[in-house]
Amino acid sequence: MIPTEPAKITEKKYRFDSFGNGEVFAGNKKGRLPAMGWNSWNAFGSGNTEALTKVMADKIVELGLDKLGYKYVVLDDGCYKSEREDGKLSNEPVKFPSGFKALSDYVHERGLKFGMYNDIGTNLCAGAAVGTCGFEKTDAKSYVDWGVDFLKIDNCYYLWDNATFSNPENARYVFAPNIKGIEIRSSGAEGGFSKKISALDGSLRGCGASVKNDYVTGIGTFDGTNTGTTPVGPMSGELVFEVEVPEAGEYELVVCYATDRVNGCGEWLQVACDCGSEEDSNVVYDDLLVPTKSSEDFVESDAIKIKLCAGLNKIRLMNHRRQENTLCSYAAMLEGLNEAEPGHDVLLSLCEWGKTQPQNWGYKVGDSWRILNDITFRVGRDGDAGFGAWIDPGTPSVTSQYNKAVIMDEFAGLEKGWNDPDMLMVGMNGMTTQMSQTHFSMWCMMNSPLMLGLDLRRVQKGDELYNIIANRELIALNQDALGVQAKRIFTTAACVCGGGAVTAPDKDYITDCDRVDVLAKPLSDGSLALCFLNLSEKEKCGDFEIGVDLIKKYLGEKLPADFYAANSFDVVNLWSGEKTCVSADEAGSGTFCVKKLEGCGNVTLKICAR
């Protein structure tokens, strides 16, 4: 049954305050390296078929890509009937006549793994009314019966957020009302304690909430779907009041508020109280308030019962439901899989496009999480390779995805999961060989999932496309057992997105692509991968120099002491195969050096201490 309201949260593990505790939900296995495989969407959009999927599986084996780690064959949108049958998912009979179990068996017989797609909303992004919302247990049983190894789960038509194709008024669930003030008073006795506090006398915590006139607005989590906002730092805003009461006991909280159903002002309020650390914070109210006539028509709420300690207390007015609701929805599918097959090995790929800042909570339920909207909206079809862009002011480009993912290394790892800047566009129209090589280098250095998105019938062993997607040395960086995403340690950029000087290349969000970046990635054998990237479409010349001291500053103990103390280094260019040797004196003065980078080009080196 499709629910009529967001899930009631009764366990603290789903709460915002638990996002940073490192606890992973049951059934979400960790220790896996980034997934590698093929996904149908960029290649064929909704036009994928059973016949095409079988050919792609055969081509993976024929080309030897399976031996390089490409294991997953994933059906994206367009494979189901448009509506459920007897409450269950079923195959689109023209495109997938044999059914999903037969196709799964075909893929498994070739030593590969089988993946499918769905959505936490009511519908899939292409429109079919078969989203998992309310059907998680039923669908999980189907996926287990079909032998599914990988689930990509999207975020369209989501009921509890203003996501793609969702009702814009769903903003009511994910933002608190505008707040003018509060009153704290003794419970049930006249003449007792009473104190009114203006919102202007509260403190704003986090990011997003702001003062407007005499009230606070924007209490919630800001939308990360698009470019222009950093993924590093606080993603939510709260209004916090400090209240001192004479004695411990039950009090009443009355909130002066006004509602709307737009970004920044909603109807859902969460109230938490604590008299010590935030870990002791108790959510005492978590629901919709009665709507008001407008966002500036303030009224008083009904009294909310709260318990306070004698002395100083903090009262937090907030709305973390954008993140909490989405976590609950993905967790429902994970829990369904746990019930259908305890000990299952299904990999969950969360595709909510960075909307709810999944880098904060995605590790609890998933193996990877998308960080932005799609890398391309011009997908291919049978006979058409589709189009991929190098630069775009929105999300659909290599550099847009890279610019965000490159500063998200702190969120990734074997015990967490992987930032997902979407599928590879190697082989699409618009992507030159140089662009494709650099795109592949970026994704390998950043430990991104390597999901091919091209018609593999266009690839022959030894051709340009093959030599990119089958570069063993680059793949080895992505699949290195240490599982550490590269860190940007140098950039020629002067300004961060929105203005201001670059002060921390590993954390600053930079969107101006007229620059050179250098990424450093420690490897399990004690060596280092160093990647020089030209994000501009124009050639860049100069002495782009990286010294051991700079590497040590950013990587520290992630590299062994022997590396920093080495007398010389063997250096291999992982695209050209060229080998050189650099002495310690040279390295110390900064001569891991590249003097020229082609437009959209890269030089990716593996550096081993002698």
Region locations from a protein language model:
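Aromatic- and carboxylate-lined catalytic core of secreted/periplasmic carbohydrate-active enzymes
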Residues: G192, G218, F222-G224, G228, ...
